[in-house]
UniProtKB/Swiss-Prot annotation:
Topology with respect to the bilayer: Peripheral membrane protein
Disease implicated: Lipodystrophy, congenital generalized, 3: A form of congenital generalized lipodystrophy, a metabolic disorder characterized by a near complete absence of adipose tissue, extreme insulin resistance, hypertriglyceridemia, hepatic steatosis and diabetes mellitus. CGL3 inheritance is autosomal recessive.
Name of the protein: Caveolin-1
PROSITE patterns xref list: CAVEOLIN
UniProt region (Interacts with SPRY1, SPRY2, and SPRY4), positions on chain: 149-160
Record-listed Phosphotyrosine modification sites: 6, 14, 25
UniProt region (Interaction with CAVIN3), positions on chain: 82-94
Task of the protein: May act as a scaffolding protein within caveolar membranes. Forms a stable heterooligomeric complex with CAV2 that targets to lipid rafts and drives caveolae formation. Mediates the recruitment of CAVIN proteins (CAVIN1/2/3/4) to the caveolae. Interacts directly with G-protein alpha subunits and can functionally regulate their activity. Involved in the costimulatory signal essential for T-cell receptor (TCR)-mediated T-cell activation. Its binding to DPP4 induces T-cell proliferation and NF-kappa-B activation in a T-cell receptor/CD3-dependent manner.
Effect of residue 132 to L: In breast cancer; seems to form misfolded oligomers that are retained within the Golgi complex and are not targeted to caveolae or the plasma membrane; loss of interaction with VCP
Residue list for modification Phosphoserine: 2, 9, 37
Record gene name: CAV1
Length: 178
């Protein structure tokens, strides 16, 4: 920790928590505090974002990386005037650039709010509803699986073994008649 910031193994900077004293991440218990000092706790809300590389995980490499050449192409022998081609390129590129910026300015923050709420609800439901339901189901099904296992071993196994012995002596001979 230097200069009031944490640096993780990937080089990301995190600011020091606002409340140093009484912070829930820094217990007052000396043994726990010493143990915790070996592990740095990061505050995800204060990490700095990269304004140059805005897609570090390459989510949109295959989807929205559209340039003029990807959309408009003139085959050999069918070319417009060079000036028209250059003006079309400039018009396409500038329009795409500024219209994206306009849409981002108008709808970026509301969409971020909507997606933030959506993923918060999704996380909440997963943590507080889905996982407990699955755990409860697994606990309840474990009891049923024991009863089912006893049923299979006491009823089904002898029945199918007997049927198998009955049909084990059945022989079929196929002859081809000419």
């Amino acid at each position: 920790m230097s200069g009031g910031k944490y640096v993780d193994s990937e080089g990301h900077l995190y600011t020091v928590p606002i409340r140093e004293q009484g912070n829930i991440y820094k217990p007052n218990n000396k043994a726990m505090a010493d143990e915790l000092s070996e592990k740095q706790v990061y505050d995800a809300h204060t990490k700095e974002i990269d304004l140059v590389n805005r897609d570090p995980k390459h989510l949109n490499d295959d989807v929205v990386k559209i340039d003029f050449e990807d959309v408009i192409a003139e085959p050999e022998g069918t070319h417009s005037f060079d000036g028209i081609w250059k003006a079309s390129f400039t018009t396409f590129t500038v329009t795409k650039y500024w219209f994206y910026r306009l849409l981002s300015a108008l709808f970026g923050i509301p969409m971020a709010l909507i997606w933030g709420i959506y993923f918060a609800i999704l996380s909440f439901l997963h943590i507080w509803a889905v996982v407990p339901c699955i755990k409860s189901f697994l606990i309840e099904i474990q009891c049923i699986s024991r009863v089912y296992s006893i049923y299979v071993h006491t009823v089904c196994d002898p029945l199918f073994e007997a049927v198998g012995k009955i049909f084990s002596n059945v022989r079929i001979n196929l002859q081809k008649e000419i």
